[in-house]
Amino acid sequence: MTSTPTKPTVAFAHLGCEKNRVDTEHMVGLLAEAGYGVSTDESDAAVVVVNTCSFIQDAREESVRTLVELAEQGKELIIAGCLAQHFQEELLESIPEAKAIVGTGDYQHIVDVLQRVEVGERVNRVSAVPTFVGDEHLPRQRTTDQAVAFLKVAEGCDYRCAFCIIPKLRGDQRSRPIESIVAEAHQLAAQGVQELILISQITTNYGLDLYGKPKLAELLRALGDVEIPWIRVHYAYPTGLTPDVLAAYREVPNVVPYLDLPLQHSHPEMLRAMNRPWQADVNDRLLDQIREQLPDAVLRTTLIVGFPGETEEHFQHLMGFLERQRFDHVGVFTFSPEDGTAAADLPDRVDPEVAQARKDALMALQQPISAERNSRWVGRTVDVLIEQHNPQTGEMIGRCARFAPEVDGEVRVQPGAEGQQAAPGSLVPVEITGADIYDLNGQMVGARAMVAAIRADA
């Protein structure tokens, strides 16, 4: 990603989640519109904007390590994102090469910040309480694959989970109007996007602050008119999956039946300790309801082990839940105590070695389940979004709708029987021929094969 500058080139280093990525893309778009060159290669520029993550300690350490490495290369730094929001003036004091800090609610001011840095100022542009949310009018230059785009439907979070610092870093929830989201979706469709991923902190709570009640179902139906084949929803909290939302999943053809459910735990006592008591009587009942209404639904969840007070009984409850519910994809994290969260001061810490052993046990339990869930797709012909192509061998790599980018598996695609191949960004039919724990194998299907298969099934 490089543009022709009329002003100096600014490099970008992106860290953290896809919500952070959208903020990066807006900053890139704003600087490009103002005439700056923008690049992802730090060697191209004297000034580097680092959009940082501060969600957990490991992420903070990665952000600080990146900042120190760039500082030692002699770069001038503009520190943006969650680390800037978290530590603010302390960063300017600790890193002399840091010329500015930009908070999570202030990235729209990046051009002004850079102009002030250019005349020698050290700038602190961090609002105490973030209130801004970008929209379709804010310039944006995407940094993701040409065919995939993330669309932020809301910013911030009204929940106060005991382990999570995000509300302090990004403020309370503030949703965009449906019309604004649909307008941006049309813009992205015009750019050739094939997969649109809706994101926020709690996507199923979309609209609650703006309309007085959640409006995800209405949003999905409105997006049904956008010419993008796949619309995927991330961060669907269980209580927000109402019958109307599940009906929208069924009714809107381009909404893929993929549910990303960050459940965190199954035991009621653990959920109360996590300040998620509303979820305790929902998990099993909701999952049964989802499978009844969306038989082909792909279910992903994330879980936390080693939360303070988690006993062996609590953990075995979670093991039983995982074995019973048979998710397609599971991510497991060990508890990370974060200063400024309620959980940071809780007693009865779990030994880190015990927490790691529990994580390993959950993943060992899940792997054959994931393999079995994948094997159900062998013999089917599905659409695959091609993301890589080897012109020498003809082999392709892509994803079908059951795999979200970066967090799930991939489909390894062989050329069709008549030599058919496809370029990245193409959505093509593929017959699934094999499966393993995480990935699928397949062969591209030509028109003749598709006609023959349909006639054989008739």
From Swiss-Prot:
[4Fe-4S] cluster 2 binds at C157, C161, C164. Residues 143-372 form the Radical SAM core domain. Residues 8-119 form the MTTase N-terminal domain. Its main location: cytoplasm. Catalyzes the methylthiolation of an aspartic acid residue of ribosomal protein uS12. This is Ribosomal protein uS12 methylthiotransferase RimO. It is an enzyme of class 2 (transferase). It comes from the Bacteria. Its cofactor is [4Fe-4S] cluster. The keyword Nucleotide-binding does not apply. PROSITE patterns: MTTASE_N, MTTASE_RADICAL, RADICAL_SAM, TRAM. HAMAP family: MTTase_RimO. Residues 375-446 form the TRAM domain. InterPro entries: Elp3/MiaA/NifB-like_rSAM, Methylthiotransferase, Methylthiotransferase_CS, Methylthiotransferase_N, Methylthiotransferase_N_sf, NA-bd_OB-fold, Ribosomal_uS12_MeSTrfase_RimO, rSAM. [4Fe-4S] cluster 1 binds at C17, C53, C82. Keywords: 4Fe-4S, Cytoplasm, Iron, Iron-sulfur, Metal-binding, S-adenosyl-L-methionine, Transferase. It comes from Synechococcus sp. (strain CC9605). One of its GO terms (cellular component) is cytosol.
